């Protein structure tokens, strides 16, 4: 098995390792409200919770939607809804992009993404674990 068992595990790992993302804008950090009370993990909107809301060093906002297994084409509509909510309530004129992270991208998802090229990015993740023996030889 090379996927996360629970979406919350993937979310927590990526929220702590936003530097792993290779996106057009550098310096991703978790979104924080101006008063610091709202964080970008499970960010609540009127259309549902966003897995991760991140902001780049230049202020660009990224709506990150996670799928622990295969990303379905319906995920594109979900991300677009979230992007609309962020644009309406948070962005204050800043650019908003979407990111779908999944263990595998289906052909239907790739087809749907072809219509929002440059606005929604898709990333496949791969889980790897390696162990190194140190200390006592057996």
Question: What does each model-found stretch correspond to?
Answer:
Residues 1-138:
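Charged, terminal alpha-helix-loop-beta segments
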